[in-house]
Amino acid sequence: MTAILERRESTSLWGRFCNWVTSTENRLYIGWFGVLMIPTLLTATSVFIIAFIAAPPVDIDGIREPVSGSLLYGNNIISGAVIPTSAAIGLHFYPIWEAASVDEWLYNGGPYELIVLHFLLGVACYMGREWELSFRLGMRPWIAVAYSAPVAAATAVFLIYPIGQGSFSDGMPLGISGTFNFMIVFQAEHNILMHPFHMLGVAGVFGGSLFSAMHGSLVTSSLIRETTENESANEGYRFGQEEETYNIVAAHGYFGRLIFQYASFNNSRSLHFFLAAWPVVGIWFTALGISTMAFNLNGFNFNQSVVDSQGRVINTWADIINRANLGMEVMHERNAHNFPLDLAAVEAPSTIG
């Protein structure tokens, strides 16, 4: 018997690095997108934590009235936030080296821009990494497609909206009450509740929650018995088992009789596609709505659309919402404007004399 021995070519350091980065045997897959994702997300997370705890007040409106957002400056977990970059900076790229000092950079809200830009780059790379790992494992690419919905939403509120409004100071603050403030001001200025794309997003989120609960409860209620009454039903499943763990025919029959036959899926694959697609498409539309309202293509305006035979206005809910919008608008940035935009835009009456 003849044995043939081949000398294995030594791989270069770069080659070994490439193999390690793209290996699916690592406990956590890195991938080429991960090479960029890891430092950007670590940077965004580190700066966010430091700024949330210790950042000094920021002159968000550019009128020399700093707003405190950090814990060490009197806030708690609910009221605290990383304050957006000052309106005095606008959309300018504002890294540390562009400021005269670190104190000036902090006063103008430099950390917000640093966090947001690194975060958006990081989550986009996370989405790319999902596709990359799917590709290496021979899977279909829909995990990354589903994740594109929250990526689009984050990009809309942190980047597209500030671009449309002309300043990063209009971006969403990085905190709980700051998020609510952003939502209230957005409603006041853009009437988002009357925008059809936002309505589709609400249907996507609430509908997705309903369908998830329905699916989970149906599956849990139609498990194939593998245990006794004294054991948890969860013990009847073994990871990787070939048999079905629940009876889809029973679930289909139950739901078809509860509502009607064609309301129930008889194909597990189409069912799970629907469960994924419904909320994803809804959030896509919401992100698209935010991106159009960024350039002031706002929600429907039905104000004073119903009048009686004498021309007097009969108020509808649209008029009630409009009054609420005006109230919210006069409250925000109260020292930055003499009048809210909706009131200041009306031509002043002429006076005789």
Swiss-Prot record:
[CaMn4O5] cluster binds at D170, E189, H332, E333, D342, A344. It is a multi-pass membrane protein. It is an enzyme of class 1 (oxidoreductase). It comes from the Eukaryota. Chlorophyll a PD1 binds at H198. A quinone binds at H215, S264, F265. Pheophytin a binds at Y126. Keywords: Acetylation, Calcium, Chlorophyll, Chloroplast, Chromophore, Electron transport, Herbicide resistance, Iron, Magnesium, Manganese, Membrane, Metal-binding, Oxidoreductase, Phosphoprotein, Photosynthesis, Photosystem II, Plastid, Thylakoid, Transmembrane, Transmembrane helix, Transport. Gene3D superfamilies: Photosystem II protein D1-like. GO terms for cellular component: chloroplast thylakoid membrane; photosystem II. InterPro entries: D1/D2 (IPR055266), Photo_II_D1/D2_sf (IPR036854), Photo_RC_L/M (IPR000484), Photo_RC_L/M_CS (IPR055265), PSII_D1 (IPR005867). The record marks H190 as: Stabilizes free radical intermediate. Pfam families: Photo_RC. Coiled coil: none annotated. The record marks A344, A345 as: Cleavage. Residues 345-353 form a propeptide. Its EC number is 1.10.3.9. Chlorophyll a ChlzD1 binds at H118. The modification Phosphothreonine is found at T2. NCBIfam families: psbA. 2 of the reaction center chlorophylls (ChlD1 and ChlD2) are entirely coordinated by water. Herbicides such as atrazine, BNT, diuron or ioxynil bind in the Q(B) binding site and block subsequent electron transfer. Belongs to the reaction center PufL/M/PsbA/D family. This is Photosystem II protein D1. It comes from Lemna minor.
